[in-house]
Amino acid sequence: MNTGKVIGKGFPKDMTETTLSGYYASGGSGDKKLIYRTDIINSVPEYPVFDNEKYLALAYKYKLIDQKYKLAVLNEVVCDVEYQEDGNSHIMYKQYMKCPKSFAFWRKICMQYPDSNKRLLVDCVHYVADSIIAKNKHYIKESPRKMLTVLATPPGLLLSLFFRIKMDSLMEVK
């Protein structure tokens, strides 16, 4: 349904530039249309490919670009979006189970460039859960935050169990 309105919070009136991470870390919400120059998109590494996995967080490149560049902001609708019932937000649990290596990779990137201490902890717990689902026994050694990863292992194990239970319940509905 097209409302012609900006989704989520608009940018503050006095804001002329920000990083995507900075916007969300300061309380921003909703989908935002990101428009980058091709040379900037091409300046960061390509999306990695993991065997038998078809998902990687699109924000991977945005997180890397945030380290070098800021975005100009515009409080206008530049693209109408129609959300699908079976769209990405409705199938995330399935994605967690089908693409754990991709999600673990994304969480490692987030742990390297944390937006806040709270977000770092959340990403670390998710990294552990994704690594457990992927059956990666070397996840602590591969972590950019080894000590925090050790501490995040118990809640990460619980989160991986939650994902499995949630996935099973979604399968029963069909």
Where are the model-predicted features located?
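Conserved nucleotide-sugar donor-binding catalytic segment
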Residues: T3-H90
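Alpha-helical structural motif
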Residues: R37, L58-K61, C99, F103, ...
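Catalytic core of nucleotide-sugar-dependent glycosyltransferases
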Residues: C79-Q84, I91-N117
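Alpha-helical repeat scaffolds in large eukaryotic proteins
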Residues: K108-M111, A129, I133
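Short, solvent-exposed coil/turn segments at beta-strand boundaries
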Residues: K118-R119, V150
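Structural register within alpha-helical repeat arrays
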Residues: L120-D130
